[in-house]
Design a protein with these regions (language model features):
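Pyridoxal 5′-phosphate
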Residues: 1-204
């Protein structure tokens, strides 16, 4: 795809410069046009009582199949769309893993999680996490360890391996961003996946 064509189709007021692409992309005219086209027949996906419902259901199922194909997922994988961005996806994951607890419930139970944290799951986060991928864990039923930066500005792999080795007998969840939205430095996901498999950890 031509970068100049991409720039021409970005929705942004003239004279404004945007530097947060890793976190949130801007509106893009071809995508917005496609959304407008789909909205012409938009309806509930859990209904089969109208042609519009069938059309929207097909959009949804085709999108799911496309994601699974692109990520090379097998039939034993499930996709759980949240519809409200990555922050909602993190919360959904925490609910499934038994980590998320509503603040009012936490206050009502009055449990001192610090006193039992070693019996809770260990969540490993990276040095360049968005707040939604760190603060929400710190308020949940888990212990959180943050891996520091290496000299090259990326993930400190030696420290990660050390933490994994020390906690090998615990339930471990690795929730590390694929890239820093400040520097743009990418995490080596193949190395991260290999480290997780070595110690039986789950990647969020």
């Amino acid at each position: 795809m031509n970068i100049d064509k991409i720039r021409q189709n970005i929705i942004l007021k003239d004279g404004i410069y945007y530097f947060d692409w890793t976190a949130s992309g801007l509106g893009y005219i071809p995508i917005e046009d496609e959304i407008r086209r789909m909205l012409q027949t938009y309806a509930n996906t859990h209904s089969e009582c109208s042609e519009c419902s069938n059309i929207t259901t097909n959009y949804y199922e085709n999108a799911r199949a496309g994601i699974k194909r692109l990520l090379k997922l097998q039939s034993d994988f499930l996709l759980l769309p949240c519809g409200q961005g990555s922050s909602a996806a993190i919360k959904k994951f925490q609910e499934i893993m038994g980590i998320y607890i509503p603040p009012a419930t936490k206050m009502a139970l009055n449990i001192d999680f610090d006193s039992i944290k070693k019996s809770l799951p260990l969540v490993i986060v990276g040095p360049y996490e968005h707040h939604s991928n760190e603060i929400s864990y710190r308020t949940g039923m888990c212990e959180v360890v943050r891996i520091p930066l290496a000299r090259d500005g990326g993930l400190h792999w030696g420290e990660l391996d050390k933490i994994l080795k020390i906690n090998a007998n615990r339930k471990i969840i690795i929730s590390i961003s694929a890239a820093s939205n400040v520097t743009g430095i990418k995490t080596n996901l193949a190395m991260l996946n290999a480290a997780a498999k070595r110690y039986g950890a789950i990647i969020a």
